[in-house]
Amino acid sequence: MRIVLLTGFEPFDQDPVNPSWEAVRQLDGVQLGSDVKIVARRLPCAFATAGECLTRLIDELHPAMVIATGLGPGRSDISVERVAININDARIPDNLGEQPIDTAVVADGPAAFFTTLPIKAMVKAVREAGIAASVSQTAGTFVCNQVFYLLQHALAGSGVRSGFIHVPFLPEQVAGSQRPSMALDAMVAGLQAAVLTAWHTPVDVKEAGGQVS
């Protein structure tokens, strides 16, 4: 049985839940075909340990595809990331109290890595399921970007496709505010559509997904 590794993060910044893990955990064991299934795992939200945990999972599971997910505060849709950059610049401390500023994710590593997922086909599929989605041009500079960069670095040249998706807050996390959110069932359905499309789409579609500024 081939495996698509799907990861989410533990809660951080004093939130009791992280919607990325709440959504991903519901997809654990879902089959994408007769010989492939999703395996969901949770990563720590810490610069020192998230990458190590991800590496162990890859070594243990030998996945055929890896998609990491995380919370994007302020995001209003399923945001499929295009690029990871070689910089840590934490606005807040991580769960171990560390706050790296302007440090490299990988010393002497490339400035950036592009996703190897069919991101525009994924966005199209999520939208066709009636759920808001877009291509994102930045994964930030916190642990999400670090994990995305380390993932692409680890799998470069392996033939294993990989990438990252950001999800919004859950409604209960932002109750009483104007911050955008998405219901958990919509998030789960959107991620499932994205993962299924990623698995079955070897070549991305050619359509606009950029931004003017």
Curated annotation (Swiss-Prot):
Q: What UniProt keywords apply to this chain's record, in alphabetical order?
A: Cytoplasm, Hydrolase, Protease, Thiol protease
Name by which UniProt lists this protein: Pyrrolidone-carboxylate peptidase
Q: Where in the cell is it found?
A: Cytoplasm
Q: Which NCBIfam families match?
A: PRK13197.1 (NF009676), pyro_pdase (TIGR00504)
Q: Which GO terms describe its cellular component?
A: cytosol
Q: Which residues form the active site?
A: E81, C144, H166
The UniProt GO MF terms for this protein read: pyroglutamyl-peptidase activity
* Record's subunit section: Homodimer.
Protein EC: 3.4.19.3
Job of this protein = Removes 5-oxoproline from various penultimate amino acid residues except L-proline.
User: Any one Gene Ontology biological process term?
Assistant: proteolysis
Q: Which reaction does it catalyse?
A: Release of an N-terminal pyroglutamyl group from a polypeptide, the second amino acid generally not being Pro
Main localization of the protein described in the UniProt heading: cytoplasm
Task: Give the originating organism.
Answer: Pseudomonas fluorescens
Taxonomic lineage of the native organism? Bacteria, Pseudomonadati, Pseudomonadota, Gammaproteobacteria, Pseudomonadales
Query: Which family is this sequence assigned to?
Result: Belongs to the peptidase C15 family.
InterPro entries membership? Peptidase_C15 (IPR000816), Peptidase_C15-like (IPR016125), Peptidase_C15-like_sf (IPR036440), PGP-I_bact-type (IPR029762), PGPEP1_Cys_AS (IPR033694), PGPEP1_Glu_AS (IPR033693)
